[in-house]
Amino acid sequence: KALVDFYKTIMQNDPRYIIGTWDECECIKVFYNTFISAKVSLVNMIQDVAEKQGNINAEVVCDALADCDRRIMGPSYMKPGMGDGGACHPRDNIALRWMAEDLNLGYDLFDAVMLSREVQAKNMAKRLMELAEVENWYSLPIVIVGKAYKPLVPYEAGSSSMLVGHYIQKAGNTLYYYDENTNDIPPEHVLNKPAVYLLAHNPEITYGDQLGTVPGWYSGEHNVTDCDTALTVATGNGTELTFVPGSIVLDPWRKTPDLKDVQVVHYGNTRGRM
């Protein structure tokens, strides 16, 4: 507050400011620059594709994308969480990897995008397995809440949840999914004992102000206030379940509050860890 008050005496305008740790402020500065560099690289990649392909005006393509003021140019997809999913996005990036090679662009941004998606899922799986290891000889089961590629749908193609699950199963850990829309419900003996939960789905974040129009959304209140509603928000179906004492909840959306007798881990928030 003292620093803010000091700068207010010398600023001639009323700038927006963010209060954070030294590390957070430095990240804001350098990642701001990186976002610009990435944006320029993507736009100029379209220009290169136009030159190589022979029937494209890059200006027409980029002007159309510039008008996408909700998903591309707006604040959407600026919430760190689960990886990109669905049948379309990963598929198109894989196809564009072939295009980059076929047109001999000389570089492959799409490969970097898909590689980062894989490694990010693997990193999350490792964190879950670390949390699950109670003793050298015993690990808690891992339950991924949300198997479909997004909440409230039955479609599994391109699911980032299943990509995380793939690395958990590959390492030999016990894994279950909880998603009524894909007909996946863990056995009662799993739900009635401590486990590690990944809250992969959060309908409120995925759908935002359109949530009320989504079929299948439970019409009750969904404020995350205790373990019942925390899991209800993640599953999106109104099921009243509790986390058994001794369980661990990893929330990549950082919305779950402190829960009695349950360890809550906000993935991506490491303040105070050092």
Locations of the language-model features?
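Structural/interface elements that position substrates and couple domains in central-metabolism enzymes
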Residues: 1-274
